[in-house]
Every structure is written in structure tokens, then in C-alpha cells.
């Protein structure tokens, strides 16, 4: 049985990301086992590395790390271990893996981005039109 694993720091955004991840995994394979765990730290890449090693030892096939810099440590350790990972908040392929020039890039499935920049840009544009 395939196992996916999601890590998250405690934030409302993180919980929404994880719900979507779980629903997508179950839609793809109703028998899939999804495991969710929390780091309770958003700025500790070393903790993310330790977390990744622990969840990989539990058999995770895909790791979705919603945990800021802590998640960076989780994703990097996961991909270096030749397991699949999904990043969050920025395009990890460029920001973490140098456009594919860093080992492990081939195990990065995707990155989930909120694109708040688009919302801010649109709001400023709308406000400027109404002035």
C-alpha cells in the first residue's frame, strides 16, 4: 500500500493545504494511507531534516511539507533520500534546487503556491483606478 506523509506547522493555511493534499491522495487511490504530523516550528530546517528522516523510516512515499523553512529541511532531506516531495510557498525547483542543478531536484514533484503577490497587485491596481 502506498503511503503519503504530510508535515505541517500549526497555521490555518497549513491545515487547508493538508486537507487538500489528503483529499487528492484519496481521490487518486482510495486505499492510500495518509499520515499527518506536526513540527510545531516554522523556522527550523534542522528540525525539518530530523522530521523527514523519521517519516521516511515510517515508509512515506511522498512528503508534503507545509512548514516554511522547517519544510525546506524536510523537502531537501526527502529528495536526497530519493523519495518524492512537494514544496510550499515558493517554486522550490528554482529557489531550492537551482533550476534542476542541485541533487534531488528530480524527486521534487511540485510546489504549492498561494500567489498572494497576484492578489496584492490586483488590489493595488483596483485601488489606483478608483482614486
Model-based region annotation:
Residues 1-131:
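A residue-level marker of the well-folded mature domains of exported/periplasmic proteins
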